[in-house]
Amino acid sequence: MTDLPDSTRWQLWIVAFGFFMQSLDTTIVNTALPSMAQSLGESPLHMHMVIVSYVLTVAVMLPASGWLADKVGVRNIFFTAIVLFTLGSLFCALSGTLNELLLARALQGVGGAMMVPVGRLTVMKIVPREQYMAAMTFVTLPGQVGPLLGPALGGLLVEYASWHWIFLINIPVGIIGAIATLMLMPNYTMQTRRFDLSGFLLLAVGMAVLTLALDGSKGTGLSPLAIAGLVAVGVVALVLYLLHARNNNRALFSLKLFRTRTFSLGLAGSFAGRIGSGMLPFMTPVFLQIGLGFSPFHAGLMMIPMVLGSMGMKRIVVQVVNRFGYRRVLVATTLGLSLVTLLFMTTALLGWYYVLPFVLFLQGMVNSTRFSSMNTLTLKDLPDNLASSGNSLLSMIMQLSMSIGVTIAGLLLGLFGSQHVSVDSGTTQTVFMYTWLSMAFIIALPAFIFARVPNDTHQNVAISRRKRSAQ
């Protein structure tokens, strides 16, 4: 990339900055949840909605982000994304109630949903094709550093300042990024087809109301009749989308995608697998603080080995898949992650705290291998003309399943804790033990899906997408 013009390198730095902001925010909040609960006068069991409101909004808005960038221009949308994200951060810091915080997090989610896909699109437009891989590696590296710094930085700010500062630090950074975007980034546009607004609204309603219904009466305060109504609305919306997309070449996501067996299996496995994995970043710092009495900063530091394990495995995951095949790798890592989850709970409750960093490092390695394998399995056999649509659907499902995972984790805590969980409670560790056992069971379930994956171990098939025409 040394031969790129200075203006292009500055534009890549702006995109990298956006990736860093978005990835940092996905992890920095987790460590602060118990302190937020105390400050807002809420039960810690309700605080999972702080994560769900953000991730679910990202899932809902992702399908529209690429079309908006093509229609309005990448600079305009990237600038808007940073402004919305920064305003959301300000409103989060000013929130005095949980409901205000949830609305502010949703606004952050709108910005976050546009930031990363539009950033990828920007790189595609400003960098020559032969340098695209190097440019993407450069801009995504800060996105890998964000999760590494997030938990510890969040814990540090909570312990020595207040939870408000995990949002306030975004404001000066966001202002600088917005100004730099206006000054340095070109406003590329492309001719677009008509946006499938009907399909978008049906999917958005279906995802949102079903996730809200899943939270149940304990989280939302809704009556059983109201929850049943939400479920009915969500199911009807998704069924209507399927009818809308059938034989519709302009549908948001073509049903032709599901003619590819590996895509169908990979998407189902990714959805189920990330529900279980999505529980862990939320539950681990909450358990360390409320269940074991760790300080926020100490709990944040304990999350670093998990991120390091994840980053370390990315270098060899292709060799592992080529050696053993997708089916063996996915079944083994799914069951392995379930066992590591049980190991973490056991060592923590036995008081073997010095072992926890090694267990979390192992958890990161296993999780990273499974994530990478799920992603490539899902997309590897799609024909070229469906690859972009399939990737967008996978990205949406990834965010949706993580929001559902956090919702289920909060639901389990509420079920076993009867709304009474605190550091001083004598039953707290028992509540967490039952919750972790349930999580381990849920994490293991996708192994049944992955057992149906063709056991293809040939390198040219395992890491390359076949070019076929979609008939």
UniProtKB/Swiss-Prot annotation:
GO terms for cellular component: plasma membrane. The keyword Transmembrane helix applies. SUPFAM superfamilies: MFS general substrate transporter. GO terms for molecular function: transmembrane transporter activity. It is a multi-pass membrane protein. InterPro entries: EmrB-like, MFS, MFS_dom, MFS_trans_sf, Multi-R_MdtD. Its main location: membrane. Keywords: Cell inner membrane, Cell membrane, Membrane, Transmembrane, Transmembrane helix, Transport. The keyword Iron-sulfur does not apply. The chain crosses the membrane at residues 12-32, 49-69, 77-97, 102-124, 138-158, 165-185, 197-217, 225-245, 263-283, 286-306, 342-362, 396-416, 431-451. It is found in: Cell inner membrane. Residues 1-11, 70-76, 125-137, 186-196, 246-262, 307-341, 417-430 are periplasmic. Residues 33-48, 98-101, 159-164, 218-224, 284-285, 363-395, 452-471 are cytoplasmic. NCBIfam families: efflux_EmrB, PRK10504.1. Belongs to the major facilitator superfamily. TCR/Tet family. This is Putative multidrug resistance protein MdtD.
